[in-house]
Amino acid sequence: ISKLFVDSEKIAWVITNLLSNAIHHSPEKSRIIVGAVQHEKAVEIYVRDFGRGIDPRYHKSIFERYFRVPGTKVQGSGLGLAISKEFVEAHGGTIGVESEIGKGSRFSILLPV
């Protein structure tokens, strides 16, 4: 994996937020996978959980300030993913989600090298 020249505190905050979300939205004792993939001009860091999943119609909205998926029982402000997006984009990167109801979620950040 290539070296990344980033604000380590901000990117650590993003990864911690993604991990915290995965833990809070997963069944007790389920596994969470964290990994990194080298691409030609970027490094992808991802967090995969096996929780409830997110309806695809909310995939864009979850990155907006104060948005919370309807019916979510986990406490939160609706700011974590919006702040994560701001931090990642400030580094010239992107953040995204792949998820289906009942199949968990995979959040990834792509940072240029």
Language-model features: locations:
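Short alpha-helical Gxxx[C/S/T] motif in the catalytic ATP-binding
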Residues: 80, 84
